Amino acid sequence: MNFKYIVAVSFLIASAYARSVQNDEQSLSQRDVLEEESLREIRGIGGKILSGLKTALKGAAKELASTYLHRKRTAEEHEVMKRLEAVMRDLDSLDYPEEASERETRGFNQDEIANLFTKKEKRILGPVLGLVGNALGGLLKNLG
């Protein structure tokens, strides 16, 4: 009689433990899904902000190019224009990263590719903001 109770209690404990493990796995998978969704939302927002920033920078660079185009330029202004043209090419390559860096990314895994594009964006956007700021400052100084 004692043996039947021991087996019954052991079975109840084992089934309760199995249910708790299953519930833990479900809650972990639900958390993973929620984290992934929030990461997608953050990436989407970041992509939209970056796209807007690129559009604004392209517009500013084109405006500066058209301003400098119709008058004689000094050597310094010529160098700024060369840099702006290079920046415009780099910004265009960010719009189509598959085509622009197809040769660069052969043989890399996905993490390395993501790091490469992040580094490329930082490498491009840092000098671009400085260049645009300097060019706008010089333009305002000349106008003022």
Swiss-Prot record:
Signal peptide: 1-18
Subcellular location: Secreted
Top-level taxon of the source organism: Eukaryota
Protein name: Maximins 3/H15
Gene Ontology BP annotations: defense response to bacterium; defense response to fungus; killing of cells of another organism
Purpose: Maximin-3 shows antibacterial activity against both Gram-positive and Gram-negative bacteria. It also shows antimicrobial activity against the fungus C.albicans, but not against A.flavus nor P.uticale. It has little hemolytic activity. It possess a significant cytotoxicity against tumor cell lines. It possess a significant anti-HIV activity. It shows high spermicidal activity. Maximin-H15 shows antimicrobial activity against bacteria and against the fungus C.albicans. Shows strong hemolytic activity.
Leucine amide PTM sites in chain numbering: 143
Tissue expression per record: Expressed by the skin glands.
Protein's UniProt keywords contain Transmembrane: no
InterPro entries referenced in this protein's UniProt entry, alphabetically: Bombinin (IPR007962)
This protein's UniProt keywords: Amidation, Amphibian defense peptide, Antibiotic, Antimicrobial, Cleavage on pair of basic residues, Cytolysis, Fungicide, Hemolysis, Secreted, Signal
Proregion span(s): 19-43, 73-122
Key word Repeat present: no
Gene Ontology annotations for the cellular component aspect, listed alphabetically: extracellular region
Family designation: Belongs to the bombinin family.
Record Pfam families: Bombinin
